Amino acid sequence: MKRPVTGKDLMIVNMGPHHPSMHGVLRLIVTLDGEDVVDCEPILGYLHRGMEKIAENRAIIQYLPYVTRWDYLATMFTEAITVNGPEQLGNIQVPKRASYIRVIMLELSRIASHLLWLGPFMADIGAQTPFFYIFREREFVYDLFEAATGMRMMHNFFRIGGIAADLPYGWIDKCLDFCDYFLTEVIEYQKLITRNPIFLERVEGVGIIGGEEAINWGLSGPMLRASGIPWDLRKVDRYESYDEFEWEIQWQKQGDSLARYLVRLSEMTESIKIIQQALEGLPGGPYENLESRGFDRKRNPEWNDFEYRFISKKPSPTFELSKQELYVRVEAPKGELGIFIIGDQSGFPWRWKIRPPGFINLQILPELVKRMKLADIMTILGSIDIIMGEVDR
């Protein structure tokens, strides 16, 4: 980082990696002129675990539990992208019931992620009270996850060709009750937060990003939609069964922190609409395509013989990836989550490249905070919505 040549004494401040407003182990080296930010340099890598290299040394079935550690607050999306790639490579058809259940789980995960963004974001800018209301609703979502998957976080629920298990008895009614209840709570958030003059003073006109600038920086998700670009991969790519439901892309024109807040708040309402339609139209049939278990059993065939069944540990079955390249993407809560896969006719991917939305959205932070006040760093960083497990991988 080059120190600006001025006649003033500048102060260099280290924020993080343990600062509570960093949302993980992010470190910012901030150069200050009084209260004004002159420069900002993010330091990444504190949570790097080599997720891409791990993927290249594991079968897809073995790697599924790992992917929930990318964005550990929206794990359904990392699972979806991990199984969607092999499904497209192998031309595997997902049963309609499994696709609907996937949509329900993805939208519940989107709501949980936005709630977990909103609570700490409000706490960062000094509003502690909404934090407790918001986490109350988040616990209801986690109760639904626990009933369906057995886990409140790190669900490991998606499988190649379907899902791990069908919905338990009474779960649909419980989820519909939550949808009705949550819509009233969103109205309460609007009364408590959106109309609060102190909140508006902190976020309105702070961290403005224009539409063309957002595209040039490669931003996605609420960061892009808050800048006047109505781009949502659920409408563009029509993956899973999203084209069978009626919902609208939520976007704003202002491009500031308030616009990003409004986009995420209205997205939760749209997610409830999608969940209600999916629950009411949930078809019957299987929840998994059993033909997808065309596993690669040709290795060491002698160990599958009758004589060895009691004395040998059989190798776990693997899904064979055909020799081709593929880029798959989904609309995660933070933006476009994608993976680039290269198969080489084996159970392991030859290359597994992750496109994390948080990492790419974080690039614009130094540009946004320059010439702003020190206190605005919390507002701008919070409005970007990052999780360092996904940024560092």
Swiss-Prot record:
One Pfam family from the record: Complex1_49kDa
Keyword entries, A-Z: Chloroplast, Membrane, NAD, NADP, Plastid, Plastoquinone, Quinone, Thylakoid, Translocase, Transport
Catalytic activity: a plastoquinone + NADH + (n+1) H(+)(in) = a plastoquinol + NAD(+) + n H(+)(out); a plastoquinone + NADPH + (n+1) H(+)(in) = a plastoquinol + NADP(+) + n H(+)(out)
Entry GO terms, CC: chloroplast thylakoid membrane
Biological processes, Gene Ontology terms: photosynthesis, light reaction
InterPro entries reported for this sequence: NADH_Q_OxRdtase_suD, NADH_UbQ_OxRdtase_49kDa_CS, NDH1_su_D/H, NiFe-Hase_large
GO molecular function: NAD binding; oxidoreductase activity, acting on NAD(P)H, quinone or similar compound as acceptor; quinone binding
Keyword Lyase: no
Its membrane topology: Peripheral membrane protein
Enzyme class: translocase
Locations listed in the record: Plastid, Chloroplast thylakoid membrane
Subunit description: NDH is composed of at least 16 different subunits, 5 of which are encoded in the nucleus.
PANTHER family (alphabetical): NADH DEHYDROGENASE [UBIQUINONE] IRON-SULFUR PROTEIN 2, MITOCHONDRIAL, NADH-UBIQUINONE OXIDOREDUCTASE 49 KDA SUBUNIT
Protein family membership: Belongs to the complex I 49 kDa subunit family.
The name this protein goes by in its record: NAD(P)H-quinone oxidoreductase subunit H, chloroplastic
Source organism of the structure: Arabis hirsuta (Hairy rock-cress)
Gene behind the chain: ndhH
